[in-house]
């Protein structure tokens, strides 16, 4: 079995990738997005279907994209992996990841998973990203893309016809720990004019403890999450790759 690297997929390849993701979702009771908006794709095809006894076109896939930030001067790649349920524990993940390491030696690797664990395989847990949602009763009008206060600012966009996306909340340093973040949110979400927006959604990093505490106090609910793991290639004491 060979590992193939691609930067783009044709329609047939997209169907094959989505079939494998759907199969893994059913097996693992997860709900990974079927979208394929990634920068690169590694795959292992099911070239010997009679031998494997499996109908799917792909046995394993690894997909990733470059995050818009750096760590110690190196770009960060976020990657996710799907291995056919009947082919797990047979080294396919290792084949994919070794190809990734060889091709992206100067990048930091992080693996994304739906489930939070202390470690994913031998990769240590780093942090989680939570997707929060709050129902607005009554519905409100659009509060504005940028709303300024003497002590901070908040930023919104329209996610769809019924939902707002809160993508920024800033409180000046000298006003922090005084309840100003809560005051901003309550003014926007509870005192705005009546309108059509029934929900507000946002994303928050689990390492931002103050923000998580605020949103939980404001009755936001966790609707989904992604956990990230340090995917750096393991090295021996002599500095060589394991």
PLM segments and residue spans:
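Intrinsically disordered, low-complexity segments enriched in Gly and acidic/Ser/Thr residues
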Residues: 144-173, 182, 192
């Amino acid at each position: 079995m060979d590992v193939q690297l691609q930067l783009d997929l044709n329609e047939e390849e997209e169907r094959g990738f989505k079939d494998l993701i759907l199969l893994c979702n059913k097996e693992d009771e997860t709900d990974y997005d079927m979208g394929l908006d990634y920068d690169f794709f590694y795959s292992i095809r099911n070239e010997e279907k009679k031998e494997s006894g499996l109908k799917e076109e792909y046995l394993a896939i690894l997909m990733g994209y470059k995050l818009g930030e750096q760590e110690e001067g190196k770009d960060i790649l976020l990657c996710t992996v799907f291995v056919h349920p009947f082919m797990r524990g047979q080294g396919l993940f290792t084949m994919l990841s070794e190809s990734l390491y060889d091709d992206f030696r100067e990048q930091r690797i992080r693996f994304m998973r739906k489930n939070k664990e202390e470690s994913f395989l031998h990769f240590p847990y780093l942090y989680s990203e939570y997707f929060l949602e709050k129902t607005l009763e009554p519905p409100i009008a659009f509060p504005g893309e940028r709303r300024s206060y003497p002590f901070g600012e908040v930023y919104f966009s329209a996610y769809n016809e019924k939902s707002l996306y809160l993508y920024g909340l800033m409180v000046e340093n000298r006003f922090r720990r005084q309840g100003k973040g809560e005051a901003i949110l309550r003014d926007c979400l509870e005192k705005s004019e009546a309108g059509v927006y029934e929900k507000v959604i946002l994303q928050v990093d689990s390492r931002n403890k103050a923000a998580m505490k605020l949103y939980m106090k404001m009755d936001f609910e966790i609707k989904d999450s992604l956990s990230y793991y340090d995917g750096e290639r393991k090295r021996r004491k002599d500095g060589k790759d394991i």
